């Protein structure tokens, strides 16, 4: 294998910024596939609430790292890192241009920068104590001991909040400060997508998600795995679950989901600027600007 660094293209951006649509156009132009770096799209049966690429989009362009596990089987950052790196290596060995797309900064950096993620088994006693405290208190604890991680973890994401607290309490080190270990021999171009009208896009996408059937999708997940499925505590699904319980209305669920998503997108943008420092694309002509930058990078 060549000792020269392998070129790898990355497209990052906050939720609802239009990554999927732009990524497909880029992949079509460069005749390559897409590796989805997303902490929820890896799970089966969660298509609407995660805004997963449609079946038609997946037929048009091959997508990796989508629907790789059932939601009852939680995948942590370390497990995802291993799965993703293996998939990307396979593409490199076939002389394909690796193209990574996602909004999860921690997951992306674990792959591209080689962050060492400690292999800490679930701490059952600790988890019981944390779950008794409730998500609000756990997120506040995490924000106190590891504020950088909360910039990339939604306030409603109980799974990743508890996992980050486990890492801190077991190792004594915040998850966000874990050092790079054996970074891959890649030459990486990071492109950033950030829309001026992001709040409006988030509101529209949230409406579309509820109109498209997130409540029915949530009901299906509940019937298959039960009300206590942890992933149902994440943004969108939690609000849909409250509607099913008659604790909320659809209008209130849309409003709350929109508010939480806007807050999460703000934290994503802060993470990208602090941890990634991408080249931001020109919003007036995204595809043209992306192609110019990628071709220059590859030449």
Swiss-Prot record:
Keywords: ATP-binding, Magnesium, Nucleotide-binding, Transferase, tRNA processing. It comes from Prochlorococcus marinus (strain MIT 9215). The gene is miaA. One of its GO terms (molecular function) is tRNA dimethylallyltransferase activity. Substrate binds at residues 15-20. One of its GO terms (biological process) is tRNA modification. Its cofactor is Mg(2+). Gene3D superfamilies: 1.10.20.140, P-loop containing nucleotide triphosphate hydrolases. This is tRNA dimethylallyltransferase. Residues 38-41 are annotated as: Interaction with substrate tRNA.
